[in-house]
């Protein structure tokens, strides 16, 4: 009874105390909800309205108790240990630490946790340094920086995205890899456990960190060996949306990528979803690259982008097709690879159903695709862009935007009703889409983008391309994506039908700054005429309800980004490439053919780039942000990836404030592997302890774009076998072609050449080789067209000569053998009569000739027939590799 009485007294006292506390609460604490700005959370109001700083609509938020605002809620995977100056957080394996994050990919095989193995590098201490655009905040709440540990287990796995089981690379059993979340001020401690039988690495894309942890094999570190562990440790001095991916071989294409979220100390209380977009191919990525290098057009067939002569005639573009080949160009395309699937957080269709009407959601979008650009649209409202490449930008509303490989965007979207709205990502080539659905209820689909009219793009490129392969500069301002020349191919664009209706703008009304000289139906520039193209829609204003497309000219930093005064170093790069042999370069030099570019700490480095190729390139600089010089002057946006379109000239600048070696390269994976990049090296940098032998490291780093890859074809027909085997690198090639008759009188022939390609377009190929002809039945000599005696049946001679690609893609060859005999030959292969039917022709001064047809059944098998002056008529199969 005594204990019961004591308990009743204590309960009564507690209730009285709580009641007194509630009665003395400030009025603001009793307020149940307030209105805040998503970009400026310090702006608070008791009524709806607009933000006085940026003009954005204030968002209703429930007011939390002060105690809850002072400390972030504990996370399940986090165990705190007290420390004098910092809180240490340990996580046994990486899990998405952000609310409403993506689930692990259900098709990837799970990975069992294993104890950490000894690391390959010692723990180091690094001091955070101030970076432009990432100034420390004045926090409204106390925050103790933590050391946050993640353990990443990299394993080979099996996935099924398409109905076929394929090999992939997963981190912690997930594709994409788990999102890693930190708060600005933390220290990242990431243990990478390589459980594969091959080497690996991880690059922390866009992150400012000690050079030795940048994650580029043989440039900043040794590769992580099989069945070993490597520690990446660096301070988090930024905030925003970033990502991480392998920088080893083709592992990025195979699934080794994930989101990296750096929260502000005072991150706005708004639901945020990391979205990792990616492209998936069932083919081995090494085979994809080999196919691109061998000029196999199977990917074009899959995408319906071969633009054969029959299609050109049917659609009224026969003259356009002829002019295209006269200028030695192949079919028009906007992408290199035909992908089976495009994925949103590892799914072709993802859902987040817990949102309701009025909710504003922040989408942290990462393009983790190896080579795919995505158009982003949303069915519920306009899209508000608030961040790019981890940096805040002043909010800008658009109807759509294109995101390049490796770019990140922070986007705000709102659900207007209690329905399900589609955030749609469409591949630039319009071959397929992937979606994220927000909310629940009736599905409100985003409008699909129509198929591209490639012949209109071909017509445009014909007018812009010189006969020598250069793109002729135009008499108009082309920079910062403000003039998308590809819009002539868009069915939703007025440029296709040359009308003035339904066009799209790339800037709001105040941004109409294109300088164009237009006449009635012709745009003239530097002796170069753009006939048949209405360029007006490329710079339409945002008035009259027209749709607005984002470009870099519209991005403005919220604070000044000007560099501190200092010596300036100006560099100029011409982006060059050759789709026929798939060699991509800067100034016609690959990484291995170029010296490192020396820069000094304290310099301001300005880079002026002109894209003199037919493809767009997302150029990425490791370890730095650069200013993209646009009309906003002191408020130029900060980025780490710049998408540069064909014919564009763009200028960027950055403060040289680091040490060590930093990679600058095109972020289309296959372009980078081909050699499109440079290395910036800080003078007087201390030695990298992870690379004790710099010469060996340089040799290993340069191997990538020098690799020799095989290709060839084997014909088995009724009259015999003919074929060719080629082993080629970016510059050198050795090839052997043969003809073996099934009858004795047909004999055996083979010609072997070794040579080097020269020039930006690689049309010139000097060679040496050996010619072997043998016939046991016939041994006759006759005069060739030069009046020289030629034994076509029995000869064994060394040869030297040169090949040159003529207009119409005709391969000409002049050679001389060790007996002084000359031979001139013309050959054209794979004339695209239809999407799958190819014509082959050959003739030379030895009075040899050939004509044949090949119908492509699969990537590796064709039906074929041909007539040969020596072996006569035959039909059968041709196997292509």
Across the structure, where does each feature detected by a protein language model lie?
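Short cysteine-rich clusters marking metal-coordination/redox-active sites
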Residues: 37, 51
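Short Cys/His-rich micro-motifs in 6-15 aa windows
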Residues: 55-65
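Histidine-centered copper-binding motifs that mark active-site loops
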Residues: 69-70, 75-77, 81-88, 96-97, ...
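Outer-membrane beta-barrel initiation region
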Residues: 292-294, 682-744, 776, 780, ...
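Outer-membrane beta-barrel proteins
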Residues: 699, 724, 729-731, 753-760, ...
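Transmembrane beta-strand segments that form the barrel wall of outer-membrane beta-barrel proteins
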Residues: 708-718, 731-742, 750-752, 764-774, ...
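Membrane-embedded beta-strands of outer-membrane beta-barrel proteins
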Residues: 723, 752-754, 800-802, 824-826, ...
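Outer-membrane beta-barrel "beta-signal"
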Residues: 851-856, 869-881
